[in-house]
Amino acid sequence: MAEPRRGDLWLVSLGAARAGEPGKHRPAVVVSVDELLTGIDDELVVVVPVSSSRSRTPLRPPVAPSEGVAADSVAVCRGVRAVARARLVERLGALKPATMRAIENALTLILGLPTGPERGEAATHSPVRWTGGRDP
């Protein structure tokens, strides 16, 4: 099996879905940093599931067929999770840098991570503001 890298698109066995989670076999983007994928703690891989839904928002950036999905899709950033490396079934492709930036921006918002000058300090709130409608 190929080694996963940050920005790769993999078919992942997520198992049965619960409470709105994406489930079953589906594409997912590897968002773990490469150093963690080859280090001591390499059994878990952090991924963002991908859905063929066309409901795009800043929290669901588009993923194009040229990046490895079968049809226009979205990265479901609110579904970010760690999975066992054994759940990675097959490498499908790699995302373009602009797509990864959109996913990183969404994760920054969802996780309340600091940006800019306050980076490195504990965040008490997200510096990025959600101004769009409902994110399903």
Swiss-Prot record:
Q: What class of enzyme is it?
A: hydrolase
Keyword terms of this UniProt record: Endonuclease, Hydrolase, Nuclease, Toxin-antitoxin system
Task: Give the Gene3D superfamilies listed for this entry.
Answer: 2.30.30.110
Give the highest taxon in the source lineage: Bacteria
InterPro entries associated with the record: PemK-like (IPR003477), Plasmid_toxin/cell-grow_inhib (IPR011067)
Gene Ontology molecular function, alphabetical = DNA binding; RNA endonuclease activity
EC code(s) of this entry:
3.1.-.-
Region called Disordered, residue ranges: 115-136
Task: Set out the biological process GO terms recorded for this chain's protein.
Answer: mRNA catabolic process; negative regulation of growth; negative regulation of translation; rRNA catabolic process; symbiont-mediated perturbation of host process
Listed Pfam families? PemK_toxin
Sequence similarity: Belongs to the PemK/MazF family.
Subunit field text:
Forms a complex with cognate antitoxin MazE7.
Role summary: Toxic component of a type II toxin-antitoxin (TA) system. Upon expression in E.coli and M.smegmatis inhibits cell growth and colony formation. Its toxic effect is neutralized by coexpression with cognate antitoxin MazE7. Probably an endoribonuclease.
**Name of the protein described by the UniProt record:** Probable endoribonuclease MazF7
What organism, scientifically named, is this protein from? Mycobacterium tuberculosis (strain ATCC 25618 / H37Rv)
